[in-house]
């Protein structure tokens, strides 16, 4: 079993180097305007600055991270450039917010998830459409897509006008345990990144999606500081492990409990 895991990690390392390019998610490529119709931006009424991302999973519900909770949250949908407003941009406020734990007591490696019910549903449009929840967990080595308006510099807060995207790999959880000594032996998180560094989510990307094969498999949670260091992958809340809770809440069971 140990040998298989070592071989798998070596294969992923080779794949990571094969995919290396000039793009970084901290400085990466501008997303195609049509590839992120489900991506939303969270900001507060006072700041007007995006502090987190989120994912539209149906016309009335948005998935994000517990760490992204704020008073007076606003949710922007259909946005690409912050300088040029699409005709179908919509803004919503939460009607209800649900957490596995209090947004103040989640841990970095457990239950960093928030489900937001919008006060008014949104309509599908050219730049707005939900993404599917996962039918199965992602496979080790899967190439997945991360995106957001987070900082594009590992050393200073430099936020782009448009969302940036990059491809990263699903890694064995043991890679993240080796990188972060305090991680428990098991957790309901995904370990994902590029082993040699360079591609990573960063400040301002929290709450945004990890998309694998057209499904939202992860929620950006946390990672190394500064972002994008070699062998310091990111941690993503594992959406598949929370499916029953998500579906129960949406169905109207407000007392649904998260997996232990």
Curated annotation (Swiss-Prot):
Q: What CDD domains does the record point to?
A: Tryp_SPc
Asked if Glycoprotein is a keyword of the record, the answer is yes
Query: Pfam families of this UniProt entry?
Result: Trypsin
- Known tissue expression: Expressed by the venom gland.
Read off the Gene3D superfamilies from this record. Answer: Trypsin-like serine proteases (2.40.10.10)
A GO molecular function assigned to this protein is: serine-type endopeptidase activity
Q: Which residues form the signal peptide?
A: 1-18
Q: What protein name is recorded for this chain? A: Snake venom serine protease homolog 2A
Identify the species of origin. Answer: Craspedocephalus gramineus (Bamboo pit viper)
